[in-house]
């Protein structure tokens, strides 16, 4: 293609051509900044042929993508430039695309010699295969901190994501707090409407209940009123909840304040009190990852396919996604090593255990010729007690010496540190209520490790994500099990509430019977000595308990507890389904805690929960437990090509 000599155009020259294509044909309105940017693009890339067919074709492509990505009616300069850069990058990728045609004829590729039946001369028939894009997996392998993750605004009315117009901050205003819970509500509500199993379910808003009779289904967030009575709250109002006789909320999940539930029952009014008598209650069902991605137009949630902080919502091309999936299956020797939590570097036994673990991995690497792992994930707390900075730093200095000793398996491997509650500077919150997401470890604390590993070390936030081709891996270090048990609401009847209050609620027992219903808490301590019996083959819990094969009462307390945790987190679509008092969240960064879409795998490192590996709605959730317990070091290895997890243990 001959080189193009750029020219300088004036917006007044470009306006008639742009109006004909953008406004008259596609109904778009070019703002002054958009016209200036378009003039510069066309003049620079098409020169004297700015009125030609190629320039018009480019403008048509811009209009098509602008409307396809639902970027609005008004075309402004910055998003227009980003969209043009995206088109240019896509064209370059397609030019590099390899066309592979394999013929059944021996020695022929893409060409078959065919002889006519009537003896006519042979002809060459060229069969073109669909091009596949060359994918270099390292370009789609990235560790994403919560504070670097692209953030979006959810437009509930149009049910689509848009780029945020304001920069997030840790010191957000009160409007961000209200928007945080409203966005959670709309995301789960729209997911509920998409579910095929709930297509016949008609959700009534709380405001619409007033003055109506009969049974209704309402959806909202569990909360408490000033009298500390349990209520349900949606975007229209709040109503007091009372459980009717025979009502047994789904026992397979927790019900913390701040979680979302569906209630079926009757609206009643006695004096000034308005109540909703609940007949059935349960959580919204989780949605498979691919279904969520398809519902929102194959969005690039993690910013792998362009500028993650640009003003354009990028979509992943199906052709690129298919090539990434093929590359993912081809790379069979890749693995991610995730160590258990509470890696106390101030404990000599921990360093001894790490030395033995590294020695085992190095021996396997040298003897069997296996590849180095993609990444090693170390989860806090990295100290057993609160320590001053200079003592805390000593632990990482000793870790750096270990890395030097085993440089053959450390060099070129992504090293990820996920902070815990006692790590700086989170340890300024001794009440176990630090604001999430937790910020990364200070660079000054691990400067020797950073110098040794260079760009391969990642001081990540908690939680953080790892993107690997089509997969999304989430790493979260928290005591979720303890917090869920502590914050689980006791769903008592109106009779118990009225004992402590003077304003009794009168209910006709002939119409609705009331009794005590309490969600019992499971045991709070577990023995980790037995290890994970089901880690290599994760148990699929997508099927409800009642329909699973075999008696459900044969499940151990550990299995019941682990299933409740997984279902609660996945059904809520959030890593912290609590109110702002039980678990404070940085309001502008709440999106980094979403599990919508569900990740490919969630490493939920909880040292107070039983070890488990469960699969729920095609999302694998793994808890490796503590790193060191009873002189046994534990870690897990994840194979992305097979999507399997293998438990490893080593006696110290």
Curated annotation (Swiss-Prot):
Give any Gene Ontology cellular component: nuclear replication fork
Instruction: Offer an example of a GO molecular function term for this protein.
Output: DNA-directed DNA polymerase activity
Domain of life assignment: Eukaryota
Sections of the chain in a coiled coil: none
Subcellular localization is given as: Nucleus
Look up keyword Cytoplasm and say if it applies: no
Q: What is this protein called?
A: DNA polymerase epsilon subunit B
State the species of origin. Answer: Yarrowia lipolytica (strain CLIB 122 / E 150)
